[in-house]
Amino acid sequence: MTQMLEAMRGNITEAMKTVAADEKLDPEYIRKMVAKGYIAIPDNNQRETVAVGIGENLRTKVNATIGTSTDINDLDMELEKAKIAEEAGADTLMELSIGGDLDNIRRTVLKNTKKPVGSVPIYQTAVEAIEKDGSAINMDPDDMLKNIEKQAKDGIDFMAIHCSVNRETLKRLKRQGRNGGLVSRGGSFISSWMVHNDCENPLYENYDQVLDIVEEYDVCLSMANAMRAGALTDSTDRAQIQELIVLGELVDRARERGVQTIVEGPGHIPINEIETNINIQKKMCKNAPFYMLGPIVTDIAPAYDHIVSAIGAAQCARYGANFICYVTPAEHLALPGPEDVREGVIATRIGAHAGDLAIDLERFGEDDIAMAHARKSLNWTEQYEHAMWPADAKAIRDKRPPEADDTCTMCGNYCAIKIVNQWLDKADKDAFDN
């Protein structure tokens, strides 16, 4: 039975208890939100994971993608990237390999982590079609479903499945046109197949069969956003909104089956459109958890897109997005390496946390408040303890140690806090009344 069906029947599962403890919320609240579809807990019943809650009134979660490419196929590096992502604080992983032995890579990653792991099954179907017949346009619709089931059996916890691309969506995309085109890899595979074969999307037509599979293994559907813009000038266009309408309808059908859903959102979007997109998605999809990809809020900062994404992530979390896919410095340039992954997770976590603070400083800002007290008392040990990455903070100060232990080399004895502690705080509260 799925987490959602258990919740609908009034049962609090161990996964719900874990999420409640992590979020410091009542387990019954988590159950009610899972039953409504407002919170998802990706937790495949084929393997053990540490449960992570994604959705309303929870801390904004961060996903890190890993995976090989056709140019760089190094399983050891991908395992290192997964480990580094976890150490940096990623809440989930997505395994998106397109090069090498895809089954072995996926299964090895799953064996080496307790984090929830996501995938995009159409990648494997397309790769196999290309290897066999030379092009993704030769994909067999039966293979699309077979790969979904195979990956579900392996233990994948959430899947990005491109069910919402249909002929009407493509018609609107074609009529309107775009500066940046269509940049979803899975969306490009499905769209090219539809155009070449002059047929409806098999994943849309056979959505009930998709639901049969994911319900059996309690896989959370991450409803893929194939029509997301790849350039700021294309954001929030008719094709994207048309797909969102379809996504909302598919969410309804999934909930009727007790299948958990997350809805993916834009990747490239101006800051001023973020709130609008979140409001529309929450309305259309009846408060399903929203998974934003980045987002990228300016298109001209390659090599620093992790910073761009952190800015977007802060705005997304602030306005109610629930799940953010990280972006690394290698975005738009190359397959990310281990250090790129670390920088991407760090940047996105900072952005997501900043957005959470705008929603509820007291609840999400315990360490921020404690840090203020530690800084005022010049207690460096406590400052490290409340830092998001304590070792990094300590390493910088230790590299350039101050003469006075209670200061740093930025100000030394001219430290404003030290001066205030010595003089202003000792003054009588009524000293400045006259």
UniProtKB/Swiss-Prot annotation:
The keyword Iron applies. Its cofactor is [4Fe-4S] cluster. [4Fe-4S] cluster binds at C408, C411, C415. Signal peptide: none annotated. Its EC number is 4.1.99.17. InterPro entries: Class_I_gatase-like (IPR029062), ThiC (IPR037509), ThiC/Bza_core_dom (IPR038521), ThiC/BzaA/B (IPR002817). Binds 1 [4Fe-4S] cluster per subunit. The cluster is coordinated with 3 cysteines and an exchangeable S-adenosyl-L-methionine. Zn(2+) binds at H268, H332. One of its GO terms (biological process) is thiamine diphosphate biosynthetic process. It comes from the Archaea. It catalyses: 5-amino-1-(5-phospho-beta-D-ribosyl)imidazole + S-adenosyl-L-methionine = 4-amino-2-methyl-5-(phosphooxymethyl)pyrimidine + CO + 5'-deoxyadenosine + formate + L-methionine + 3 H(+). Pathway: Cofactor biosynthesis; thiamine diphosphate biosynthesis. Keywords: 4Fe-4S, Iron, Iron-sulfur, Lyase, Metal-binding, S-adenosyl-L-methionine, Thiamine biosynthesis, Zinc. Substrate binds at M94, Y123, H162, S184, R185, G186, N225, A226, M227, R228, E264, Y291. Catalyzes the synthesis of the hydroxymethylpyrimidine phosphate (HMP-P) moiety of thiamine from aminoimidazole ribotide (AIR) in a radical S-adenosyl-L-methionine (SAM)-dependent reaction. HAMAP family: ThiC (MF_00089). Belongs to the ThiC family. This is Phosphomethylpyrimidine synthase 2. It comes from Methanosphaera stadtmanae (strain ATCC 43021 / DSM 3091 / JCM 11832 / MCB-3).
